[in-house]
């Protein structure tokens, strides 16, 4: 039995992780609707589930990771109309932008990134099968899911049909039998992108896309289905209803959801004007700092985005990079062996075990980062020894690299050119002149992390490589 325990939204408790097939994990993560650049809420989901994938691979699992693109949707059609472009052109542009953003954030590409428009036939077959089983019906070119027929509806979001009924309404123009029913196929309106189907020209509804693509690429039952907390209902609830009605099997064994992201203690929304796009923010800050920030809170908890917390994350990452850099620079001056090598190697092994213990407990990256800080503390203590050995230094470096890689963090730093150092010193001098001491300190810390030591003298600032 695996020592990993994860919180399952379906059961509302932590459970031992036992994939359907030993050592193999089938994982589906709901991807973006590509009508704009992704915002930092999307980035949190991308970073969180990339890290969970990395950790499962670190623990020896063979992970097949699928994350979709919704490349046809009401929002895309609206954007195309406003910009005077085609839906495929807009989708293609923002898919490319998505890959650029997540790569900057240290996220690996999924094994498969299916697009809705490349899977229309699969979706149509799925819908037809639901009609054949009595779970869906067609009205004037629209196809709806018969929600009440699926008796377990509400089991993921822990709501009863009666509770859901109270808030359900039929919109003007909808012809469904029941307010709880939802669209599987939408009849085309004039000028909209559409495909031929047994019910006339149209396009898929949102919920059916993920059910059809998850089944096509991962089978009837998958190990982990994941996404943002806001997708629990109705999206994931509807996916379960569709998939389990068709196959008669559980759709996913474990459901994982990351918590909300707030901006300065307010919900992020366009109406409040606090919408932060990854495309913009990574031009202002190191993307690794944003990733570190996202992982500094447990993935299920809400996280508050603010300048102060980003600055705290920057300092934390700098501490780790400085410890790693100091080890690298000490390597050349180290001997082959010292008397207490085994004691230090044992300490490092204990720290690795602590990291695994924390991450095994529902992927607790916040505590995992705390363990990395302990590794940095022990490394700094070791470097105070009169003599150091290559064996121990290598053990520290290897542990830093492996554990940081699980979190998608890179501690190695490219060496600065002399002119780059001089430019940063000039920028620091200007900041001090303008009494912007926070910026001056930040530049000094960044240089120190890259092993550049500054000395302020009456004649000006001198520097040397440590």
Curated annotation (Swiss-Prot):
Quick check: keyword Flavoprotein in the entry?
no
Query: What keywords appear on the UniProt entry?
Result: Aminoacyl-tRNA synthetase, ATP-binding, Cytoplasm, Ligase, Metal-binding, Nucleotide-binding, Phosphoprotein, Protein biosynthesis, Zinc
**What's its EC?**
6.1.1.16
According to the record, cofactor stoichiometry and binding are noted as:
Binds 1 zinc ion per subunit.
Instruction: Please give the superkingdom of this protein's source.
Output: Bacteria
Tell me where the sequence motif 'HIGH' region sits in this chain. 32-42
Position of sequence motif 'KMSKS' region: 267-271
Keyword Transmembrane listed: no
Q: In the record, what terms sit under GO molecular function?
A: ATP binding; cysteine-tRNA ligase activity; zinc ion binding
Compartment(s): Cytoplasm
Residues modified to Phosphoserine = 271
Cellular-component GO terms for this entry: cytosol
Q: Which family does it belong to?
A: Belongs to the class-I aminoacyl-tRNA synthetase family.
Q: What is this protein called?
A: Cysteine--tRNA ligase
The species is: Geobacillus kaustophilus (strain HTA426)
Gene that this sequence comes from: cysS
